[in-house]
C-alpha cells in the first residue's frame, strides 16, 4: 500500500484533506506539529481524535520551541493580541507565522523519506493566498522543486495540495460527502475551550457552514 504523510493540525482543511488522501488509497502517516501556538493543547487533542477516526498507520507528534522565541506573530507571541478577523482582508494579518509552512513541509519531507512514503499532503487553500505567502501555489511549486533536489528516494516524493485553488465552503462540501467528523476539529486561533467566533479562522469556518445552510458542531463563546 502506498503511504503519504498528512500534515494534520486538527483544523477543517487538514482534516478534510487527510480523508481525501485516504480515499485516494494512501495509508496515512499523520504528522502533527506543536510550534508554541496559543491553541496547541486543543489542536493536538483534535488531531488525535481525527487520527483515531481515520485509522492512521502512525501518528507522529513533533514539538518546536523556536517559533515562540522568534515571536512576530500573535499565534506564538502572547504579547500580541490576536486581531479580529475581516473576511476578504487584503493586507498582512498578524496571525502569519514567518515561514511556518516551509518548516512544516521540510519536517514532513524528512518523515516521508524515512518511511519510504510517496506523497505529502498539506491543506493550503485559496483563502490563505493573501497575507500568507507560504500558502500560495508559487510557494508550493518552489518547495516541490526543493524536495525533488534534496531527497534520495528513487521515486520522487510528491507535494500534493488538492485544495490550493478551493475555498473553505467547497472544502466543507467535499468533507461532508466523505463524512468528515467536524465536531472533532478545531480552527480558532485564540481559544482552547470555546471558539472565539471573531478571529479570521473562526469567521471563515462559520461562513463555510452558513453557506451550506449548516450549523457548526463545535462550541462558540456566546
From Swiss-Prot:
UniProt keywords, alphabetically: ATP-binding, Ligase, Metal-binding, Nucleotide-binding, Zinc
Keyword hit for Nucleotide-binding: yes
Cross-referenced InterPro entries: QueC, Rossmann-like_a/b/a_fold
Gene3D superfamilies in alphabetical order: HUPs
Residues annotated as binding ATP: 8-18
Positions annotated to bind Zn(2+): 188, 196, 199, 202
Domain of life: Archaea
Pfam families: QueC (PF06508)
GO molecular function: ATP binding; ligase activity, forming carbon-nitrogen bonds; zinc ion binding
Textual note on the cofactor: Binds 1 zinc ion per subunit.
EC nos: 6.3.4.20
Cofactor(s) recorded in Swiss-Prot or TrEMBL: Zn(2+)
Catalyzed reactions per annotation: 7-carboxy-7-deazaguanine + NH4(+) + ATP = 7-cyano-7-deazaguanine + ADP + phosphate + H2O + H(+)
Pathway: Purine metabolism; 7-cyano-7-deazaguanine biosynthesis
Alphabetical list of NCBIfam families matching this protein: 7-cyano-7-deazaguanine synthase QueC
Record's function text: Catalyzes the ATP-dependent conversion of 7-carboxy-7-deazaguanine (CDG) to 7-cyano-7-deazaguanine (preQ(0)).
Homology family: Belongs to the QueC family.
Name of the protein in question: 7-cyano-7-deazaguanine synthase
Amino acid at each position: 500500500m502506498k503511504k503519504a504523510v498528512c500534515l494534520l493540525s486538527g483544523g477543517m482543511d487538514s482534516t478534510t484533506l487527510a480523508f481525501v488522501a485516504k480515499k485516494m488509497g494512501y495509508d496515512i502517516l499523520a504528522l502533527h506539529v506543536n510550534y508554541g501556538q496559543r491553541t496547541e493543547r486543543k489542536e493536538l487533542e483534535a488531531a488525535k481524535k481525527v487520527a483515531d477516526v481515520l485509522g492512521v498507520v502512525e501518528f507522529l507528534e513533533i514539538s518546536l520551541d523556536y517559533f515562540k522565541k522568534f515571536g512576530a506573530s500573535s499565534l506564538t507571541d502572547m504579547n500580541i493580541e490576536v486581531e479580529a478577523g475581516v473576511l476578504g482582508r487584503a493586507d498582512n494579518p498578524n496571525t502569519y507565522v514567518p515561514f511556518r509552512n516551509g518548516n512544516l513541509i521540510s519536517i514532513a519531507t524528512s518523515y516521508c523519506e524515512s518511511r519510504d512514503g510517496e506523497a505529502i499532503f498539506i491543506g493550503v487553500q485559496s483563502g490563505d493566498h493573501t497575507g500568507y505567502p507560504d500558502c500560495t501555489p508559487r510557494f508550493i511549486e518552489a518547495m516541490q522543486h526543493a524536495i525533488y533536489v534534496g531527497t534520495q528516494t528513487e521515486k520522487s516524493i510528491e507535494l500534493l495540495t488538492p485544495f490550493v485553488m478551493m475555498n473553505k465552503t467547497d472544502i466543507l462540501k467535499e468533507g461532508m460527502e466523505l463524512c468528515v467528523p467536524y465536531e472533532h476539529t478545531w480552527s480558532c486561533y485564540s481559544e482552547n475551550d470555546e471558539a472565539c467566533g471573531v478571529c479570521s479562522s473562526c469567521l471563515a469556518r462559520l461562513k463555510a457552514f452558513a453557506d451550506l445552510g449548516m450549523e457548526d458542531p463545535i462550541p462558540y463563546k456566546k
